[in-house]
């Protein structure tokens, strides 16, 4: 920095201290300017929070959002073009229904109904994905651009204006000790910065119809999503009602138990036949995947000591996305990298991928 630049920084710092500590009066900006500055500040805060809340509306699970961010980061590191999408709850429900519907088979009314409902839920997930894309393109991206460009530029102009005001007030306070030409130049720069900042704020506030159009695009995308969702659910409701009518009209099959096979008294006694009924998991608002949650631990095999970064699997881990490394309890995994505080990258059976830290016990840590 030049000597002139250092002097200017000293002038501004000195004036700021005299105003904050000594109570000195600085040059006051007019009320219209202050009113515009206030409106721009409110607009900036509104846009920032609306962006955050819109993303939460589209992708409500914070753990899934964090995991998706991590997966996208890993994809960029590996040079992968296709990034995994957000796991829509409708899609997860649909996959569950389809899987169990197939297990029950075509002879089960409930199984057929689960297949119908599952396919409809998967269609709802596809429509929700389309909503995400539409809202991102026509609402989130334009608002983000407003934050990154226009509002950021206004903040730059206001910061520059404040610096020139401090420089002008310092020189004005020392009028007579500082050359008149230097004071005149400081005043011109201050007025120039004020005009630039004022113009940029005025342009933003006068063109807020653009933000209204973007908000309208958000509502249009929501309407389109809900129309398609209603159509899918109405079709599903008709299918299920038809299945109820068909099942009710069929005669009930009579059940005739088969006689028990004779057995010798010397044979081992067996418990009565039956089938286990798995208890339904308790659903809570926070039952989605969390990096800190740990399943119930079952005893695992002891492993020999190692001389390279490695860990032992405490629980089974089923990969849900490309790039994840699946393993079974007791598997010994070689550690190659730590993605973040919740995820490792490692190798097992010649395959590389990443996995949650909470599913393993580190035996030999990675070098710092």
UniProtKB/Swiss-Prot annotation:
Q: Where is this region: Required for dimerization upon membrane association?
A: 60-87
Q: Which residues form a coiled coil?
A: 180-250
> According to the UniProt entry, which residues carry Phosphoserine?
288
The UniProt regions of compositional bias labelled Basic and acidic residues, in chain numbering, are 245-261
Cited Pfam families: BAR, SH3_1
Q: Where is this region: Disordered?
A: 243-309
Describe the location of the BAR domain by residue ranges. 18-249
Q: What is its main location?
A: cytoplasm
Q: Where is this region: Interaction with ARC?
A: 218-254
Q: Where is this region: Membrane-binding amphipathic helix?
A: 1-21
From the Swiss-Prot or TrEMBL record, state where the protein is found: Cytoplasm; Early endosome membrane; Cell projection, Podosome
Q: In which tissues is it expressed?
A: Detected in brain and testis (at protein level). Ubiquitous.
Record-listed Phosphotyrosine modification sites? 315
Q: How does it assemble?
A: Interacts with ARC, SYNJ1 and DNM1. Interacts with PDCD6IP. Interacts with BIN2.
Stated role: Implicated in endocytosis. May recruit other proteins to membranes with high curvature.
Protein name as annotated: Endophilin-A2
What is the native source organism of this protein?
Answer: Rattus norvegicus
